[in-house]
A protein has these predicted regions:
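Short, hydrophobic beta-strand segments
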Residues: 21, 49-58, 102-107, 141-150
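Transmembrane helices with small-residue packing motifs
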Residues: 4-32, 55
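Envelope-exposed proteins and targeting segments
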Residues: 49-51, 81-84, 139-141, 175-177
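Extracytoplasmic
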Residues: 38, 42-44, 67, 109-209
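Membrane-proximal juxtamembrane linkers immediately C-terminal to transmembrane helices
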Residues: 32, 41-50
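Short amphipathic beta-strand/extended segments in non-transmembrane regions
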Residues: 54-56, 70-96
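Lipid-exposed faces of alpha-helical membrane segments in multi-pass integral membrane proteins
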Residues: 2-9, 205-209
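Second-shell loop/turn segments in exported
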Residues: 24-27, 58-63, 151-153
């Protein structure tokens, strides 16, 4: 009877276990430096809620690749939990006489190779884009997503990040472009999944022994 009661209590406790996947909680310390970090984070929300989508492929800067990339950014902007994004397509040319700064990559890409080559050259030489949102060889690009904390808390990080990955792969994979996710929210999810697996394993072993 005693063993049965202990087992029942252990199972009830196991079902109520929660994992705090915040990187801030992971590295929490009772130091002035950490308290300063918390104060700054409250005033200026940090990149702990920025997810990175890494797009890679030899066809990235072709007409087909850029069209697919643009489609992916549009889909990601509408994905649950995404409040905004920045990519190489955010780059603008110098303002004209009226003060309008046109996007370097227009919505309608030119059909002729020379016109496309001019756009690609401007993109690769842009100070904001080169080495930050686009690799020097033109085969790797970065999309930075700003996530809505309240939506992530409501839907869970697993749902939001899973939706982002699914949308990106759907738009890019058919065009020979691979997708990888990185950034603090993705790391948080990996930590959470690993800790939950370990908890289940160790609690299961505890019940057995």
């Amino acid at each position: 009877i005693v063993i049965a009661l202990i087992t029942a209590v252990a199972v009830a406790g196991l079902l109520r276990l929660k994992v705090d996947d915040s990187l801030a909680e992971l590295f929490r310390t009772n130091t002035p430096e950490f308290r300063t970090y918390e104060d700054i984070d409250r005033r200026f929300p940090s990149s702990e809620y920025d997810a990175l989508v890494v797009v890679e492929g030899k066809s990235l800067l072709t007409r087909d690749g850029l069209t697919a990339f643009a489609g992916a950014t549009s889909e990601l902007q509408l994905a649950d939990g995404v409040s905004g994004l920045v990519s190489m397509l955010s780059a603008r040319s110098k303002p004209d006489a009226n003060g309008y700064a046109a996007p370097i990559v227009p919505d309608d890409l030119p059909e002729d190779p020379s016109g496309l080559a001019t756009i690609v050259a401007a993109l690769k030489s842009n100070d904001i884009v080169k080495g930050k949102f686009l690799s020097d060889d033109g085969e790797l690009a970065l999309i930075v997503l700003s996530l809505d904390r309240s939506v992530v808390a409501e839907l869970t990080a697993k749902t939001v990040i899973g939706g982002i990955k699914e949308a990106a792969e759907r738009e890019l994979n058919p065009h020979g472009l691979s997708v990888k996710l990185s950034g603090a929210p993705v790391m948080q999810l990996e930590i959470r999944n690993a800790v939950e697996r370990d908890q289940l394993l160790y609690n299961g072993l505890g019940l057995l022994f």
